[in-house]
Amino acid sequence: MPCIQAQYGTPATSPGPRDHLTGDPLALEFGKPTMDLASPETAPAAPATLPSFSTFMDGYTGEFDTFLYQLPGTTQPCSSACSSASSTSSSSSSATSPASASFKFEDFQVYGCYPGTLSGPLDETLSSSGSEYYGSPCSAPSPSTPNFQPSQLSPWDGSFGHFSPSQTYEGLWAWTEQLPKASSGPPPPPTFFSFSPPTGPSPSLAQSSLKLFPPPATHQLGEGESYSMPAAFPGLAPTSPNRDTSGILDAPVTSTKSRSGASGGSEGRCAVCGDNASCQHYGVRTCEGCKGFFKRTVQKSAKYICLANKDCPVDKRRRNRCQFCRFQKCLAVGMVKEVVRTDSLKGRRGRLPSKPKQPPDASPTNLLTSLIRAHLDSGPSTAKLDYSKFQELVLPRFGKEDAGDVQQFYDLLSGSLDVIRKWAEKIPGFIELCPGDQDLLLESAFLELFILRLAYRSKPGEGKLIFCSGLVLHQLQCARGFGDWIDNILAFSRSLHSLGVDVPAFACLSALVLITDRHGLQDPRRVEELQNRIASCLKEHMATVAGDPQPASCLSRLLGKLPELRTLCTQGLQRIFCLKLEDLVPPPPIVDKIFMDTLSF
């Protein structure tokens, strides 16, 4: 089959004008080609033709491979022009070469015109130098002609990638400028090599003429533009006897920038395994498989072991072989563990929330926090203390109490009961008890809690008593209503402050006073479980605050205040009994009920 090579690209700048060149089509037929190129030394009116190929290769009956040669002129060197031809017959018909033709076979610097038995330099160029054959001057070594100086080729870039021509047009244009003009008409439009089909019966190759018409205009490919091969040039792909290039012209020829953008790098690929990835997960573009693997590993705090050298390949096919190396690569590419939601924050779309195995405040830390919050919410703040009734100078306490003093005593007790009830409801686990046990625990521990909380808030050194409502009274102001009981409360307050009890420890101690075993409980087991949890919380806190050698002694001294507290509770019941006997003011129903319920014990 005949094979014609045509290469397109940005030609180098010509040193002279080229607007007089003609653009006649070039006819290609299946036969031996002759070249109707005039010699620079012949007369302009009668251009002579070049010798036929049969003259050069007389006696050779094989096939001609693709060749690339340079034609030197007599006045200036010519660059190489790219052509190709093949012959299927060994006919000896050849065109007659005039005597004035100055071309000899020795003057051709052959780059790729060898019989079929020789290895073609074109194949070597394609395999060694890549795109240099198509996009830049041929750099492969070639046989040299004696006494012939090759033209110096200046490097220039080809804009059409693999279809860029060699830079042999420059010398060819300069050489053809000396040819006579074929016509006096206007210059032809910019065109590439054009090959016209035969108009008649197919003659022999010796009868078909080969005419070269370089483009007069410079065609450059702008950045970001892409061109496809024109449909008017079918079969003009660079070919080789050993290569199949029938589908080259079917695909568009794009610029270097567009080709590099199409091949895309790693965009759209998983950074871990290279699979398809649509978006970013945990800070890195990953596939759904690696996203789920990373999330499960972080949520479960999974630990993996590599059975190899901790350098296992992680790709789409082998990503499940070593979980250790896969997780390490997830971290190496930048996936962030802190972004993964924990179990408590996981979305539960489409599912009913499962019942927790234990209450959310089951841990000692959460329980201690809840106890501290309940204690702070039930007490008055320092900014809201009421000093409106506070008096340091009062009459001596000798004499009998009046109704006003008794009423004040009852009001302080009943007011404290409401605050203590609200505080107890905020203790984790208390409201889960049955209502009967809740009331029993409150009524049994009411006086103890009243004394303990009053002693902790008061300032015994200044003689100030701070009640739960924020009311501040002096010790002498409470002497007639409370009697000797108030002196014992202040003494207990001094001993409690001497221990240096902090708020967390006091919050746990107050809860233990309320949550304890009482006679008549309906569900004592649940009360005991809640008591053990609070005791463990207090023990852990004391161990943290006091240190290793001190926690046992500090805890025992703190719990040693509970018997003193029960003694003070008994004294308070006795005071209520005395005031009830005097019958100056009837006691409130809740106080009377508490008193009557404790008499039987």
UniProtKB/Swiss-Prot annotation:
Family matches, as Gene3D superfamilies: Erythroid Transcription Factor GATA-1, subunit A, Retinoid X Receptor
Induction data: By serum growth factors and during liver regeneration.
UniProt keyword terms in alphabetical order: Acetylation, Cytoplasm, DNA-binding, Inflammatory response, Metal-binding, Mitochondrion, Nucleus, Phosphoprotein, Receptor, Transcription, Transcription regulation, Zinc, Zinc-finger
Domain NR LBD: 363-598
A single GO cellular-component term on record: transcription regulator complex
DNA-binding region(s) from the entry: 267-342
Tissues expressing the protein: Expressed in testis, thymus, brain, and heart, and at lower levels in ovaries and spleen.
Required for binding NBRE-containing DNA, as annotated region: 271-357
Cofactor note: Binds 2 zinc ions.
Entry-linked SUPFAM superfamilies: Glucocorticoid receptor-like (DNA-binding domain), Nuclear receptor ligand-binding domain
Residue span of region Disordered: 1-21, 180-205, 238-268, 345-364
InterPro entries: NHR-like_dom_sf, NR4A1, NR4A1-3, Nucl_hrmn_rcpt_lig-bd, Nuclear_hrmn_rcpt, Znf_hrmn_rcpt, Znf_NHR/GATA
Stretches the record annotates as AF-2: 587-598
Annotated region (Required for the interaction with RXRA), positions in chain: 302-364
Region of interest (Required for nuclear import), residue spans: 173-469
Residues modified as Phosphoserine: S344, S354
Major location category of this protein: nucleus
Post-translational modification: Phosphorylated at Ser-354 by RPS6KA1 and RPS6KA3 in response to mitogenic or stress stimuli. Acetylated by p300/CBP, acetylation increases stability. Deacetylated by HDAC1.
Disruption phenotype: Homozygous knockout mice display restenosis, the narrowing of blood vessels upon vascular injury. Mutant mice do not robustly raise blood glucose levels or increase the expression of genes involved in gluconeogenesis in response to injection of cytosporone B. They do not exhibit any increase in serum IL1B after administration of lipopolysaccharide (LPS). When challenged with LPS, mutant mice are partially resistant to endotoxic shock.
Localisation per UniProt entry: Nucleus; Cytoplasm, Cytosol; Mitochondrion
Job of this protein: Orphan nuclear receptor. Binds the NGFI-B response element (NBRE) 5'-AAAGGTCA-3'. Binds 9-cis-retinoic acid outside of its ligand-binding (NR LBD) domain. Participates in energy homeostasis by sequestrating the kinase STK11 in the nucleus, thereby attenuating cytoplasmic AMPK activation. Regulates the inflammatory response in macrophages by regulating metabolic adaptations during inflammation, including repressing the transcription of genes involved in the citric acid cycle (TCA). Inhibits NF-kappa-B signaling by binding to low-affinity NF-kappa-B binding sites, such as at the IL2 promoter.
Subunit structure: Binds the NGFI-B response element (NBRE) as a monomer. Binds the Nur response element (NurRE), consisting of two inverse NBRE-related octanucleotide repeats separated by 6 base-pairs, as a dimer. Interacts (via N-terminus) with NLRP3 (via LRR repeat domain); the interaction is direct, requires binding of NR4A1/Nur77 to NBRE-containing dsDNA and lipopolysaccharide, and leads to non-canonical NLRP3 inflammasome activation. Interacts with GADD45GIP1. Interacts with STK11. Interacts with IFI27.
UniProt free text on domains: The NR LBD domain binds the lipid A moiety of lipopolysaccharide (LPS) in the cytosol.
Homology family: Belongs to the nuclear hormone receptor family. NR4 subfamily.
Name used for this protein in its record: Nuclear receptor subfamily 4 group A member 1
Source organism of the structure: Mus musculus
